[in-house]
């Protein structure tokens, strides 16, 4: 790494630390020529995930949008932000592991529903009502009956 102070092309790493789920590395460096110290960060660049919308359009995957929809479903529920962030990261890493760069919205929605079902049934119903485009009270009754049947197994 080039020194930003004297432009020496070789610097020494004094300390390295992983942060943000080991996706970012912070390095403390020192220049042997001018003895200046500076910090660099290295971030793992992942491939660009695309989302195939229901209308056929393509959109860049947005982790914040995923988080926002889950936060809406879990609002005022006893679900910690740590668990929500872990869920978002797990879904993201699972999507990253798929061979396709373009993922249909229904695949992402199904992953969210599967995770919410395990985490909080009320949040699951809330998310399902939007994701599955509930039209009337019978749609709610059907999903609640499904939850009751799953719990009785």
UniProtKB/Swiss-Prot annotation:
Keywords of this entry: ATP-binding, DNA-binding, Metal-binding, Nucleotide-binding, Repressor, Transcription, Transcription regulation, Zinc, Zinc-finger
Function: Negatively regulates transcription of bacterial ribonucleotide reductase nrd genes and operons by binding to NrdR-boxes.
Family annotation (InterPro entries): ATP-cone_dom (IPR005144), NrdR-like_N (IPR055173), RNR_NrdR-like (IPR003796)
Cofactor: record remark: Binds 1 zinc ion.
Domain of life: Bacteria
Name the UniProt record assigns to this protein: Transcriptional repressor NrdR
Organism: Ehrlichia ruminantium (strain Gardel)
Family statement: Belongs to the NrdR family.
GO terms classed as biological process: negative regulation of DNA-templated transcription
Family matches, as Pfam families: ATP-cone (PF03477), Zn_ribbon_NrdR (PF22811)
């Amino acid at each position: 790494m080039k020194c930003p102070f004297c432009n020496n092309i070789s610097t020494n790493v004094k300390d390295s630390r992983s942060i943000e789920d080991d996706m970012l590395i912070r390095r403390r460096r020192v220049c042997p020529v001018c003895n200046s110290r500076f910090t660099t960060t290295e971030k793992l660049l992942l491939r660009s995930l695309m989302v195939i919308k229901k209308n056929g359009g393509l959109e860049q995957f947005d982790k914040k949008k995923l988080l926002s929809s889950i936060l809406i479903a879990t609002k005022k529920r006893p679900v910690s932000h740590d668990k929500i962030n872990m869920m978002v990261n797990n879904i993201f890493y699972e999507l990253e592991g798929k061979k396709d760069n373009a993922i249909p919205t229904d695949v992402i929605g199904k992953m969210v529903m599967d995770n919410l079902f395990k985490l909080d049934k009320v949040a699951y119903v809330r998310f399902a009502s939007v994701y599955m485009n509930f039209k009337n009270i019978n749609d709610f009754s059907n999903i609640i009956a499904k939850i009751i049947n799953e719990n009785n197994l």
